[in-house]
C-alpha cells in the first residue's frame, strides 16, 4: 500500500523533485528540477531510523573489490550544471565521480546505479545544491593565501601567473622563465587547490617562449605591460600551436604597437583567449570589445565591473594606477589609466554576458579583481540582468534554468575547455574529478557549505572544535582534513604542458601532486563555449562617445544601487 505526501512535506524530507523550484540565495533566480533520478519511497537517506543502514540501503555483503561500491555517496542532491538541473545521488570512488543516479543496496532496492556498502561514507544533500568547483583563469599569483580565499566562494582551480608581490606579477599574469616556473610549481605542491601557470609570451624568436613550455607552463600569456606586440603575439601563438597549450592576451591599451585591427591580424584566425574583453582592466581602447564577435576568440571578462553598479567606475581608476605601476604625478600615466575606464563599455559588458557573447567570468585576482567573488558576482550579474532584461527565451515564472545554466557555465565548463582541462574537471559528469561545491540554497553564490577536492572534504563551514557538536558558533569556513598532509597530493592537480608531462616534469623537479597535461586547446572556436557561443555579426564602439552597438543597435544598461548576495551575507 502506497503512502502519500504533499509536495512541501516531501521537499522538506527528501529535497525538491521534478517541477519544484529552488530560489538561489536572495536573488530572484529560480532553479527548477528537470529530472529526478531517485525513486519515490526508496530514497537513500542517511540517519537514525533511515534507509542507509546495514542490510537495508547499505549492502551487507559487497566489499570494495566490487567496482560498483563507492567511497562516498552524496544523497538527494540538487545538481546545477551546464548539462542540466537535476535531482540525483552522486557516487564518488577513487576521487572521481563514477555515477550520477541512484545509489543503494541492489539486494533490497530496484534499479540501483551504484552500491552503498560498508566502505561508503554518506553526505546528506537533500535540499542542498551541488555544483562543479569553480575555475578562475585569471589569477595573479601575488599572495599565497589566494587558494583559501578562492575556496571561500567555491573556486577550486586557479590558472594564471606570477611569483609573489614582484611588480611584474602585480601587473601581469605571467610566471617568466624556467627558474620561476619550477619554483612556483614546487611552491604550490602542498596547497589544496588545482594550479596551472602561464608563461610570458614575448619575443621575436619562438625559443624564448618554447623553453618556458618545456619547463612546465600550461599556457602562454602576452601582456601589454611586457609588450603586446605583433611579433610577440605571433610567436607565442606558434609555440601554443606546436605544444597544444592555450594562449591568452591582454592587448595594447595605448595602441602603441598597433590598433585592434592589427592585433586581430596577428591572430591569423588562431584560437585566442582574450582577457578583459570589456576593456576597463586593459586592452585596446576603446574597441577591444569587438573581439567578442570573432569566431576564433574565446572572450572573458573580470569581476570588478560585474555587475555594473553606481560605485563600479569610482574604484577602477585607483586600481589601474596601483596594478600597473603608474605614477599619479605623471599626466601621461593618469591619461593611460583614464583611457581604460569607460562606463559605456562597462554597461554593455553586463548585456553581452547575458546574451552569451562573453563566455567566461574570471577575477583578475589582486590586480583589479577578487578571487573570492567570481561565483558571487556571476550570480549578482544574472540576477541584475533578469531584473533589467526579463526572462531569457524558454524561461518562465519560477523557472530561470536557461539563464542559470548559461551563467554556471561561465566559471566551470567554459574555462575548463579554454585551457584544455575539461577532460578532468569543470562539470558534474561521470569520469571527472570530484571537485564539488555543496551549497545551502539560502547561501548559494555567497558562502559554500562544503568543498570537496578529489572526493575529499577540504573546506567547509565548521563550528568550534572545542564544543560538544559541530554546530556551535562561530561557524565559519575552515580547512578540513583534505587540506592537510599527503591528502593534498592525492586530491589536487598541477596542470602542465604535454611536453613537460611526457618528459617527466613531476619526477624531475620532485612534485608530489597529481600532474596532468592540458590538451585540445588549439582547434577551439566560439562554438565550443557551452551556452555562451553567441558571436554578433558586428560590434561597433563609437570612438567619441564609447557607446556600444551590436548590429547597429545600442547595447547598454543602468547601474544598480544595491545587489543581491551582499549585505545580507557580509558585514563589510
Swiss-Prot record:
Residues annotated with N6-carboxylysine modification: 221
Localization (cell): Cytoplasm
PROSITE patterns per the UniProt record, alphabetical: UREASE_1, UREASE_2, UREASE_3
Subunit structure: Heterotrimer of UreA (gamma), UreB (beta) and UreC (alpha) subunits. Three heterotrimers associate to form the active enzyme.
Binding residues for Ni(2+) 1: 138, 140, 221, 364
GO terms for biological process, alphabetical: urea catabolic process
Active site per database record: 324
Protein family (similarity comment): Belongs to the metallo-dependent hydrolases superfamily. Urease alpha subunit family.
One CC-aspect GO term: cytoplasm
HAMAP family tied to this protein: Urease_alpha
GO molecular-function term, one example from the UniProt record: urease activity
Alphabetized Gene3D superfamilies for the sequence: Metal-dependent hydrolases (3.20.20.140), Urease, subunit C, domain 1 (2.30.40.10)
Protein name: Urease subunit alpha
Pathway where this protein functions: Nitrogen metabolism; urea degradation; CO(2) and NH(3) from urea (urease route): step 1/1
Enzyme class: hydrolase
Amino acid at each position: 500500500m502506497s503512502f502519500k505526501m504533499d509536495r512541501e512535506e516531501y521537499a522538506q524530507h527528501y529535497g525538491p523533485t521534478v517541477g519544484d523550484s529552488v530560489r538561489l540565495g536572495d536573488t530572484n533566480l529560480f532553479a527548477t528540477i528537470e529530472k529526478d533520478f531517485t525513486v519515490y519511497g526508496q530514497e537513500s537517506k542517511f540517519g537514525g531510523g533511515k534507509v542507509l543502514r546495514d542490510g537495508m540501503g547499505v549492502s551487507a555483503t559487497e566489499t570494495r573489490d566490487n567496482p560498483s561500491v563507492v567511497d562516498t555517496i552524496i544523497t538527494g542532491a540538487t545538481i546545477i550544471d551546464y548539462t542540466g538541473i537535476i535531482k540525483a545521488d552522486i557516487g564518488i570512488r577513487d576521487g572521481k565521480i563514477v555515477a550520477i543516479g541512484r545509489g543503494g543496496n541492489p539486494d533490497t532496492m530496484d534499479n540501483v546505479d551504484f552500491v552503498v556498502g560498508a566502505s561508503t561514507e554518506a553526505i546528506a544533500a537533500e535540499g542542498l545544491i551541488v555544483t562543479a568547483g569553480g575555475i578562475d583563469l585569471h589569477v595573479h599569483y601575488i599572495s599565497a593565501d589566494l587558494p583559501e580565499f578562492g575556496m571561500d566562494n567555491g573556486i577550486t582551480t586557479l590558472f594564471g601567473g606570477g611569483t609573489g608581490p614582484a611588480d611584474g606579477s602585480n601587473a601581469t599574469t605571467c610566471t617568466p622563465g624556467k627558474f620561476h616556473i619550477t619554483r612556483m610549481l614546487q611552491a604550490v605542491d602542498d596547497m589544496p587547490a588545482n594550479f596551472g601557470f602561464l608563461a610570458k609570451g614575448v619575443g621575436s624568436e619562438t625559443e624564448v617562449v618554447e623553453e618556458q613550455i618545456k619547463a612546465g607552463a600550461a599556457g602562454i600569456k602576452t601582456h601589454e605591460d611586457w609588450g603586446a606586440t605583433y611579433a610577440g603575439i605571433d610567436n607565442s601563438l606558434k609555440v601554443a600551436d606546436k605544444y597544444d597549450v592555450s594562449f591568452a592576451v591582454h592587448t595594447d591599451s595605448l595602441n602603441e604597437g598597433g590598433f585592434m585591427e592589427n592585433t586581430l591580424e596577428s591572430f591569423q584566425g588562431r584560437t585566442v583567449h582574450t582577457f578583459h574583453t570589456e576593456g576597463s582592466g586593459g586592452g585596446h581602447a576603446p574597441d577591444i570589445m569587438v573581439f567578442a564577435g570573432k569566431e576564433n576568440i574565446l572572450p572573458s571578462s573580470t569581476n570588478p565591473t560585474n555587475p555594473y553598479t553606481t560605485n563600479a567606475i569610482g574604484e577602477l581608476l585607483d586600481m589601474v594606477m596601483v596594478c600597473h605601476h603608474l605614477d599619479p604625478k605623471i599626466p601621461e600615466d593618469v591619461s593611460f589609466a583614464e583611457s581604460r575606464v569607460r562606463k559605456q563599455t562597462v554597461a554593455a559588458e553586463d548585456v553581452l554576458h547575458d546574451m552569451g557573447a562573453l563566455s567566461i567570468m574570471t577575477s583578475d585576482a589582486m590586480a583589479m579583481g577578487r578571487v573570492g567573488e567570481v561565483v558571487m558576482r556571476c550570480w549578482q550579474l544574472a540576477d541584475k540582468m533578469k531584473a533589467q532584461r526579463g526572462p531569457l527565451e524558454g524561461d518562465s515564472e519560477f523557472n530561470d534554468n536557461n539563464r542559470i545554466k548559461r551563467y554556471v557555465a561561465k566559471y566551470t565548463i567554459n574555462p575548463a575547455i579554454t585551457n584544455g582541462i575539461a577532460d578532468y574537471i569543470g562539470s558534474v559528469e561521470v569520469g571527472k574529478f570530484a571537485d564539488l561545491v555543496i551549497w545551502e540554497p539560502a547561501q548559494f553564490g555567497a558562502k559554500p557549505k562544503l568543498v570537496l577536492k578529489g572526493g575529499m572534504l577540504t573546506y567547509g563551514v565548521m563550528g568550534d572544535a572545542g564544543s560538544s557538536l559541530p554546530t556551535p558558533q562561530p561557524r565559519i569556513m575552515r580547512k578540513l582534513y583534505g587540506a592537510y598532509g599527503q591528502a593534498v597530493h592525492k586530491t589536487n592537480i598541477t596542470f602542465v604542458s604535454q611536453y613537460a608531462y611526457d618528459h617527466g616534469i613531476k619526477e624531475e623537479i620532485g612534485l608530489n601532486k597529481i600532474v596532468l597535461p592540458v590538451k585540445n586547446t588549439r582547434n577551439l572556436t566560439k562554438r565550443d563555449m557551452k551556452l555562451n557561443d553567441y558571436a554578433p555579426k558586428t560590434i561597433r564602439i563609437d570612438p567619441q562617445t564609447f557607446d556600444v552597438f551590436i548590429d547597429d543597435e545600442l547595447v547598454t544598461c543602468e547601474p544598480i544601487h544595491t545587489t543581491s548576495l551582499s549585505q545580507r551575507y557580509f558585514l563589510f
